[in-house]
Each structure stands twice: as C-alpha cells, then as structure tokens.
C-alpha cells in the first residue's frame, strides 16, 4: 500500500463526484440492485421510463449550452409506475453529487407530502451508499458536513396560496436547485407562478420536475402539455407499458369503465380527462374539430358571425372570433379591459372589415 492510496471513504467521494452530471450512472452505482435481503433484491435497475428521464437530465447537464438553463420535466401517468421512486433517486443524486444543493419538495396535499412522498425519499436515502452523508427527519434531509446543514438540504414544504414565500426563496446561485411537484395537477397555479419567478439564478443548475396523475383538465400542470409544451419536456406514461405494475388490476379498470373513460385516462393511460368541471364541450370534440379542413367555397353561402368573449373575470385573455358556417378563426386576442368603448370600437372595425 502506498501513501497515495485512497481510503474507502475517499474512494467513494471520488466515485460519486464522477456522477455529477449523470443521474442514471449514479442510480446504478449507489443503490443495492439485486442484492439479497434488500428492498431492491428483485430489481436490476431503474425502470425504462425512469432511465429515459435520467438520460434527459444527463444530456441537458453535460451540454455546456443548456447546463445553466432551467430543465423542466413533466410526467403525467397512470398509477403504480414508480414516480416516488424516481423523485427519491433524483433527489439523492442531486444532494450527493453537488455541494450545497438545495431541494424543495411539495405535493397536492400536506397529507400526501407527509405520508407518501417524503417517507419514500427517506427510504431511498437509507438504501443509498451515501446514507451516512445525510441526516433525515420527518420534513428535511440535510448534509452532515459541519456548517453546511442550513445550505445543503432538501425540505418538504406544504404549499398554500396564502403562504408562497417558501417558493419565492429558491435562490442558490452557482450551485444546484431541484424543485419537485408531486401530484402536480392539484397544486395551485399561484404556487407554480411563484416558483417559476424564483428560478432566475445565473450559472446555476436548475431542475424542476412535475409529476402526477392527470386528474384535472385545467391548471398549470395541464398547460405543461399544451400552452407551455415548448418549455417543458413532457411525456404521458401508460401504466400498462411499465415494468412492475399490476397489469391484471389495470385491465379490470379498462373492462369496467372503458378505454376512453376519464377514469381509465387518468388512472391508467396518463391522459388528461376530456372535460373539466368548468367545461361544457369535451376536449376530444374540440381537438377533432380543429383538425378538419374547410374551404372557402364550402362556407360561401353562410353568414359571417362575430363572437366576443370580453373575459371580464378569470385569467384568460379577451378574444374576438369569426365564424362562417363550419369555418372559424381568431380575429383578435389581447388583454381584457373594462372600458366597453374600446372593445366596441374593436368589434365595429371587424364588422366593417368582414
């Protein structure tokens, strides 16, 4: 043995440092896959969809062009695919491979956070080869490195529309930030907006993951797959395609409720339901209608009708629409106004034009 030989702990630190931008490599190295007597005795590694998501993170971080741009991952899925396990492995990698990493975890309800999401994070931390590096409590995981317990930590934080300060303080410049929204469909839009506004540190690795069953057809989680899909890396995962799910139970649901029922869409297929509680026309019908091609000759006989949604309440923009037979198009969309004269002038101008 030479003087330069590393101690087992020093060798571990060096090995783990090699996975700074490789969460899949870390997961395969750090957890006791296939080891008898452990909870992972019958598993050979992360599930396929988990490995794919880890590769997305790896590719984002290993590319200097994208490394310091926020990476936002959204996954809508049915039941039993291993969302909590993925979140737990992600957090353990993030904390173990970056000094003073900051992690914030929230969920749809305080009960979900305390009894499901966070206990799973603790379980995986205790399985990891780096378990002695951190202390876990009922609401936090922090570094045992002297003087780092306040800066190098993960916290379970219940959200409230009346108390969003916890998500406004997500600054960790030149380090790493991980934000986790579990069962994201039922986290209020305001919390999303506050969290988004905080992710502005430069030269910082920022990863935001939003997972859950697609229970609602409205809200920010839904818009990750629609209005903001150019910002989020999205996937919708059918539980029947994932290793380790109870295929018989899933098939019973399909048999009982039907493949196209909202129950199966939400709990099996990872697809958002057709209609929300505030929606009159199901999304499936409008999606089909928007794909149809209508020629000018087909609607030449029909009168031109102008429709107006002034959007006096709610968060949507005001809209002026034209309809002629089965043809329709947006004429104008913009900020709402309570000045009726301004809107009347806009409408009159379009009446003159058409």
Model-found features: residue ranges?
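Phosphate/NTP-binding elements of NTP-utilizing enzymes
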Residues: 2-308, 320-328, 333, 345-354
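Primarily the active-site beta-strand->alpha-helix module of PP2C/PPM metal-dependent phosphatases
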Residues: 312
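Short beta->alpha junction loops
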Residues: 332-340
């Amino acid at each position: 043995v030479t003087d330069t030989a590393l101690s087992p702990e020093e060798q571990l630190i060096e090995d783990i440092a090699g996975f700074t931008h490789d969460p899949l490599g870390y997961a395969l190295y750090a957890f006791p896959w296939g080891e008898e007597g452990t909870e992972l005795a019958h598993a050979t590694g992360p599930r396929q969809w988990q490995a794919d998501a880890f590769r997305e993170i790896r590719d984002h971080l290993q590319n200097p062009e994208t490394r310091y741009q926020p990476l936002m991952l959204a996954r809508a899925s049915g039941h039993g695919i291993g969302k909590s396990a993925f979140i737990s492995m992600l957090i353990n990698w993030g904390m173990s491979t970056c000094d003073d990493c900051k992690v914030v975890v929230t969920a749809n309800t305080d009960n979900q956070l305390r009894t499901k999401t966070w206990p799973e994070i603790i379980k995986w931390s205790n399985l990891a080869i780096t378990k002695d590096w951190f202390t876990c409590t009922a609401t936090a995981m922090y570094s045992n490195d002297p003087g780092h317990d306040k800066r190098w930590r993960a916290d379970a934080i219940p959200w409230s529309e009346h108390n969003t300060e916890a998500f406004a303080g997500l600054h960790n410049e030149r380090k790493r930030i991980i934000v986790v929204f579990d069962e994201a469909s039922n986290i209020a839009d305001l919390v999303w907006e506050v969290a988004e506004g905080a992710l502005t540190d430069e030269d910082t690795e920022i990863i935001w993951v939003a997972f859950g069953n697609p229970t609602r057809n409205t809200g920010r989680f839904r818009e990750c797959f629609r209005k903001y899909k150019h910002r989020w890396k999205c996937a919708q995962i059918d539980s029947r395609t994932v290793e380790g799910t109870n295929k018989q139970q899933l098939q019973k649901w399909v048999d009982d409720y039907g493949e196209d029922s909202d129950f199966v869409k939400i709990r099996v297929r990872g697809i958002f339901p057709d209609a929300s509680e505030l929606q009159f026309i199901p999304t499936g019908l409008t999606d089909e209608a928007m794909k149809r091609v209508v020629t000018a000759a087909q609607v030449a006989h029909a009168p031109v009708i102008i429709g107006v949604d002034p959007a006096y309440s709610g968060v949507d923009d005001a809209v002026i629409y034209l309809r002629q037979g089965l043809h329709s198009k947006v004429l104008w969309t913009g900020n709402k106004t309570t000045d009726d004269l301004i809107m009347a002038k806009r409408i009159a101008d379009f009446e003159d034009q058409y």
